[in-house]
Amino acid sequence: MTEATQAQPAVPRLTSLSHGGGCGCKIAPGVLSELLKRATPPALFPDLLVGTETSDDAAVYRLNDEQAIVATTDFFMPIVDDPFDFGRIAATNALSDVYAMGGKPILALALVGMPINVLPHETIAAVLRGGESVCADAGIPVAGGHSIDSVEPIYGLAAIGVVHPSRVKRNAAARAGDVLVLGKPLGVGVLSAALKKNQLDADGYAQMVATTTKLNRPGAELAALPGVHALTDVTGFGLLGHTLELARGAQLTARVHYASLPWLAGVETFVADGVFTGASGRNWAAYGTDVRLADGLPPVAQALLTDPQTSGGLLVACAPEAVDDVLACFRADGFDRAAVIGEMVDGPARVDVA
């Protein structure tokens, strides 16, 4: 057999090279909170409008009375095996934090860590092209970045956006009486677990990629709506974790209506069969003491509510009279599953699910 006809080594599955994937590989919220407590607090800068105080989605720094910079970074290990899709999902997820602050992205830098001697260069290039395609869709350049040779594949972006200082939307400004609206269906972590176990069919994969590559573009328009008080996105800490951040920031109780939650097709069946991520359990261990689950919820409820979302939906807290405008804003951009899922009420800083 000549060298030209020798069988080439099989390219490993991207997900086989990482111990976690997507936002499910975040440091557990309880551990992260403890680490941040030990960090040196930043000096007080009057123009730093948003820092680390409430675990918000991005930093915001005021340049002048008309402009503020939104700065964020997000990267993770593969949630899918297709390199182009991996790049698209990671980039969409990174840009989401800019939208979640009410901002508009203007620039991105690529963050790349790859096992250079394990993956073919064309595979790595496909990851980069995937990220670039999403940034092109968002109307921004990937203007540079940084790369390292790493044991596990890692990809993401540092993203810069702009926002008017008066339109910055924090995760700590919800008010009693506000209605909670969620932009995307839940269950990405469950589908990713099914994929890793070779249990996800083509339709399931297609819906997972479709939701995780849909840019949360309505964020800037939502921030401009009267009556929108708080905004965040649902990612690695699951719906309960990010709703709890709203509750803690506002010192209110968030009520979530389980029957109103939108789910990706098949996720409830997968969880009933024992298919879900380890991050779900870590999330519950971190914040479950501040959650009340009503009697009578399905047995799968806890795992689904703590399911880590990668490139998840925007979560809006708005006045009741703004709900129709919020839903219209989502649906105008193709978010057909956007739904009212609960409300904020006076009470201790926790989440009640009924």
UniProtKB/Swiss-Prot annotation:
GO terms for cellular component: cytoplasm. It is an enzyme of class 2 (transferase). Keywords: ATP-binding, Kinase, Magnesium, Metal-binding, Nucleotide-binding, Selenium, Transferase. Mg(2+) binds at residues 57, 97, 233. One of its GO terms (molecular function) is selenide, water dikinase activity. The record marks 26 as: Important for catalytic activity. GO terms for biological process: selenocysteine biosynthetic process. It catalyses: hydrogenselenide + ATP + H2O = selenophosphate + AMP + phosphate + 2 H(+). InterPro entries: PurM-like_C_dom (IPR010918), PurM-like_C_sf (IPR036676), PurM-like_N (IPR016188), PurM-like_N_sf (IPR036921), SelD_I (IPR023061), SPS/SelD (IPR004536). ATP binds at residues 26, 54-56, 74, 97, 145-147. Its EC number is 2.7.9.3. Its cofactor is Mg(2+). CDD domains: SelD. The active site is at residue 23. The keyword Transferase applies. Homodimer. Synthesizes selenophosphate from selenide and ATP. This is Selenide, water dikinase. It comes from Burkholderia orbicola (strain MC0-3). The lineage of its organism: Bacteria, Pseudomonadati, Pseudomonadota, Betaproteobacteria, Burkholderiales.
